[in-house]
Structures are given as C-alpha cells and as structure tokens.
Amino acid sequence: QEARSSLKHYDVVVAGAGPSGATAAYYLAKQGKSVALIDRAKFPREKACGGGLCVHIEEFDHIISNWDDFLESKCQRGIVYGPEFLPVDYVSEKPFFYNIRRLQFDNKLVEYAVAEGATLIEGIAVKDFEVSEDKVSVKLRNGDELSGEVIIGAGGSYDLVSKRIREIENMPMNWRDEDIAMALYFEVDVGREFMDEVYGEERISMAHIKYDGLDGYGWSFSKDTVLNVGIGCPRNIIKKLKSEKKGWSERKYLLDYVETLKEQGWFPKDIEIDRKMISGANIPVGMGMSCTVGDRMMVVGDAGGFVSPLSGEGLYYALDSGRLAAESLDVLFSEGDFKKQDLMHYHRAWSSKWGDDLEWLKVGWHLLMVMPNSLIKYAALDEETKEFFTHMFVGSMPAAKIKNKVLALIAKGVLKHEVLSLMTGNKQTVPDLVS
C-alpha cells in the first residue's frame, strides 16, 4: 500500500514498522485511531537478531494467541560458558525463552496492525518532519506529504525523531561507541536430525561469555531446524581491535567462533559459512534516553535505547514501549494536548515499569565482563543460582531481584575478592570452590 494522496491527516504517524512501531500501530488502531505506519523496507524483510523472546512476551495476548504464526521452538535448557569454558547448565520444567525468526515475526506484527486498521506505507522512508502548534507535517522520500497529531519514532538506532529530541534537549546526537553493541549473525538450516540429537527436545539456547577474551558473547540459538549463530561486542572494542590488529575483523571473529562450535559439537562440521551469509546491526545498550518525548514527538524501541545492556535482547522492550506509547496517547487524545509535559506520561510509564531493570542489567553486564570466571563458577554451584543467572541473562529477571542477589553475593563474600581487587588495585586470589 503506497501513499499517493497529498496532505492526508492521521491521528498518529509511526515512522518505522519494526516490532516497536508495529505494536504501537496495532494498539492505536485497536483504539480506533487513524494510523500511518511507514517503513523504508518492504515486508517481509530480514533483520539481524538472535530471535529470542524472554517470558515477559507472554504479557501480549495477540502474541501468545498467535504462536502458530511464528513460533519456532520453546527453550527449556540454557547453557552459558565462561571464558574458561566452564558451563552453567540450567534446565527448566517450563519454557523460559521462545525462539522466533525475525522475517516471519516482524511481518506478522505488521499484518496484525493492518488488520486492526493501520495504513501501511512501505518501501518509502521518512525524509523529514516539522512540528507546529497544531500538527506534525511529514515528508516522504518519494515527495508525498502527510500529517498527524503526533509522530512516533520507531526507526532504530539512528531514528529521525530521536535525533530531533536529542537536539532539543542538548543531548549527544549519537550513541557513544561503548553504548552501541555491534551484532553479527547468520541463520542456517542444519536439519532436524542434527537439531534433535544435539540441541534436543529442550532446544538448548547457548552462549559463550567473553569468547576469545573480548567483552560481549557469542551465541547459538536453536529454532526448529535452523541455527541462529552470532556474536555481540561493544563498538569501541571492535574499533580498537581493528586499529591494533592488522587483518582483524568482526566477520573473521564470528567465523572463528563457528570453528569453536564445530570443535565442541554444537555445529555441523560439514557446513561451511560464507562471509556473504553474515548480516549485522548496531544495537543501543546505553539504558535508554534521558528524555524520550518532545512536543508531539515520542520514541519507542531501539530509537529510545530500550535494549538489555546485558544480553542485547530488545524485542520485549520494543513491544512494551510500543504498547505503553499507545496507552499514553489514548489518555492524551481525550484531552487533545500533546506538549512535551503531556507526553511525559509515556516517559514516566516505561521508566517506572522497567527503567530500573535496564540500570541493573548494566550493573550485571559490568560484573560479568570484569569477573566472568568467578560469576560462572559460583553460578554453577546450585540450581537456585543457576536459575538466577540464566533468567538475568535472558532478561526475565526483575531489577529488584538482580540488585538483591548481587548485593547478597557480595555481602556473603562470594565476589568480595575480585571487588576488593578492583577497589584497591591489588590482585586477590579467588577462593577455592566449596560445596
């Protein structure tokens, strides 16, 4: 569906039809709002991602009632390896992680929004927009124009609406390199026989923390018959390595990781991965923008930086920020006021719901990168700690539990040796593990 009518007015213009934008459009359309859902791509389209959904996704009725549309597998076992390849092997009686493929998942979210009445304008990017006293005027790359009461930026890390808010609020115009994770991945069909034999009915999801000593992690997520394999690493680390090591590249790093998976038996030895099969993305992991609204403007999903700083998981935050944006607008449309102070209703909503989670997941990230072997060793000791570690990593652990557990571990002396090392500069020996 292409926009050819000039100056058509909508209640809300959503710039970006990924999970956050499509979800915002879905809920707004259900409310009876007129919605323009715009994206530069034509759907279905692929997106670089591990394709994992934490259990919080069960909050969305239109997701769990349509599992058959896109669900690939339910994960009931997670294995996390430390730098020394000691594993934390956690088995759950019920799924704690759901596997999808973004090609199908994102397309279905768009279809759900359109089915509720949203107008899809695909294959055309937003060129610019202007906020005035009574509307937002939007210009598209093909020359068409439209307007709305509010514009929602859902265009990812380099979103136009996000940049406008940053400019107004005197915030840095771009994410810092240390707040961007570069993710590379590929998907390959390994066949049902290999998948059932190696990854089992539990459809193991696996990660290698600080593979080859680099901050970040490598992963192998098992779908139905497809493996999703990738690596994620802060952009500043990648830039540093490229400048210091001649010939080093993130693609070579991923291919080296595949060889390790083959050696461990997690990847078929007879399948070769070509560099052309690899895709990448920049993921903001900086705990969210300090301000996510302006006059007649708001941002959702990656555009607002709503991604777990620990694992890079952003699908739940994408969907929930889209829903929270729609719920806030439903209140504001009854009053007809869309100034920044009115739209702060949305900013407060996401901040109070999971803003603390993002902050404590960042704490978890730093602990895991600074003292990975100690955390892995202690996490492997008992089932309760395994459960905590796994749920924290996949993003299903509330901030309060993360905070309380980490502080309790330090208070009990589990981590104090390495914490003291950081504080004093004196290397402390990690105590021997005891039952």
Q: What does each model-identified segment do?
A:
Residues A3-G18:
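Beta1/beta-strand and adjacent pyrophosphate-binding region of the FAD-binding site
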Residues K42-V80:
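N-terminal FAD cofactor-binding segment of flavoenzymes
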Residues S92-E111, L241-S249:
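Short beta-strand to alpha-helix junction loop
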Residues D330-S435:
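C-terminal helical "tail/cap" subdomain of flavin- and related membrane-associated enzymes
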Residues G21-A22:
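N-terminal Rossmann-fold NAD(P) dinucleotide-binding loop
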Residues A29-A48:
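Glycine-rich FAD pyrophosphate-binding loop
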